[in-house]
Regions:
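Membrane-proximal helix-turn-helix segments that form the acceptor-binding/catalytic region
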Residues: 114-150
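Short hydrophobic beta-strand element within catalytic cores of glycosyltransferases
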Residues: 311-314, 318-321
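Conserved acidic donor-binding segment of nucleotide-sugar-dependent glycosyltransferases
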Residues: 333-344, 352-359, 373
């Protein structure tokens, strides 16, 4: 099988790029020849540009084109739109990382023009995005119906995607986020209990709630809280860690100081991927206190999961999560617990529960380790091969559907 993968890839720093790198390796191990035609290309920001880019390439040499859709990225979405109109096209597939929508962001010319105006106030841009949303949703549904197969990482995400995109249930496969195969490391000594926030550090991840919850535990039960340490770790890309109000990191550090937590909070920033397992496994528990954007809620329900949670599972560690996204499903296997997002008192109670009954940590860790075996990337790759075979059976090429169209000039330039 020959597959063209449309996705960001490292060294680009985002969760989908990290996912795609492991995904590509798992497919290679399953015997799939993976091409990455978007690698090194400039972003594609219009359907006309996508059609021109697609027309230059001979897609007859590919069995499946699979895209990683998420993060509001346009290149992959627009390329799939262009490919969908090709005669005798290959099978088209996508992993939807942010269901219930495919892209969430407008793709029309007005939005492109407005979004490029640095002087335009952010509320004005958001108003344009909201007014453009009916057209965005129409484009998403059109592409979703044209795809031969879609993948979500959770059942929750699949259910929302099917409903919002108006798809047949059998068009969507659920394939859990793959887990790296890592050496088992037992939990560290239970005094102190070490909590870890791990992920990109920017507003919207609810890190403030975690700091406030630990502060609440300390204020109410100082002796109990003395057995607690918190590490805040992750990426700090300047475009997300700094904003109009200054450094977000400085704001978090000031919050830690106001809560009297400075001696109990450690910071590990811009962690190298090779060091992630060691970082996670020297902690007892990951805490992901995400909050959903109220503005995004005007457009729908985002029910994706998290690469950070996948790391916790791979490393054999439990998690306390908010009920944002599809987190409640991901820790419903006995590998953690959840609380209502934004409820600092509920999060503080969860932390107190762990301090009072630390034996729960080993139970969560054991279940996480079992999940990691079930979701190992080599097995995940095989599941995707099955998904692609089903998509190929649905594709126009398999059904013998063909029509005349412009000849590709790709063979004159370079070969897939």
């Amino acid at each position: 099988m020959r597959l063209a993968l449309l996705s960001p890839l490292p060294p680009e720093q985002n969760g989908i790029a990290d996912y795609a790198a492991h995904f590509r390796t798992s497919l290679n191990q399953a015997g799939v020849d993976v091409l990455t035609p978007l690698a090194g290309q400039r972003p594609i920001d219009s359907l006309a540009a996508a059609r021109a880019w697609v027309a230059e390439r001979d897609w007859r040499r590919v069995d499946v084109v699979h895209a990683e859709l998420g993060g509001g990225r346009q290149s992959e979405f627009l390329t799939l739109c262009a490919l969908a109109s090709l005669p005798n096209r290959p099978a088209l597939s996508a992993t939807v990382h942010d269901p219930e929508r495919l892209i969430w962001k407008p793709i029309n010319r007005v939005w492109t023009m407005v979004n490029g105006m640095s002087a335009m106030p952010r509320p004005a841009k958001q108003a344009v995005a909201l007014l453009s949303d009916p057209a965005t949703l129409m484009a998403e549904r059109k592409l979703a119906r044209q795809l031969d197969g879609l993948v979500t990482l959770t059942q929750t995400g699949a259910g929302r995607l099917v409903k919002r995109m108006k798809l047949p249930v059998d068009r969507v496969s659920v394939i859990s986020h793959g887990a790296l195969t890592l050496p088992h490391k037992p939990l560290p000594p239970l005094d102190p209990i070490r909590l870890l926030y791990f992920g990109f550090i920017y507003s919207g991840k609810g890190i403030e709630d975690l700091i406030d919850a630990v502060g609440k535990v300390k204020a109410q039960q100082p002796e109990l809280a003395s057995r607690l340490r918190l590490t805040i770790a992750g990426g700090t890309s300047p475009d997300i860690a700094f904003g109009a109000q200054g450094s977000y990191l400085d704001q978090l550090r000031a919050r830690v100081e106001r809560r009297g937590l400075t001696p109990q909070v450690d910071w590990e920033l811009d962690v190298d991927e090779r060091d992630i397992p060691y970082l996670i496994q020297r902690h007892h528990l990951m805490v992901l206190p995400y909050r959903e954007s109220r503005k995004l809620a005007l457009l729908g329900q985002m029910r994706g999961t998290s690469g950070s949670l996948a790391w916790a599972i791979a490393c054999g560690r439990g998690a306390i999560t908010s009920d944002a996204r599809a987190f409640a499903e991901e820790i419903s296997h006995g590998n953690g617990s959840s609380y209502r997002q934004g409820d600092v008192a509920a999060l503080a109670a969860q932390i107190e529960g762990v301090l009072n009954k630390p034996e729960i940590l080993s139970q969560w860790a054991d279940r996480a380790s079992a999940l990691a075996q079930e979701r190992a990337w080599p097995m995940t790759g095989q599941r995707f091969v099955g998904h692609f075979q089903r998509a190929m059976a649905r594709a126009p090429r398999a059904r013998g559907v063909s029509s005349s169209g412009p000849a590709s000039v790709w063979s004159q330039k370079e070969s897939l």
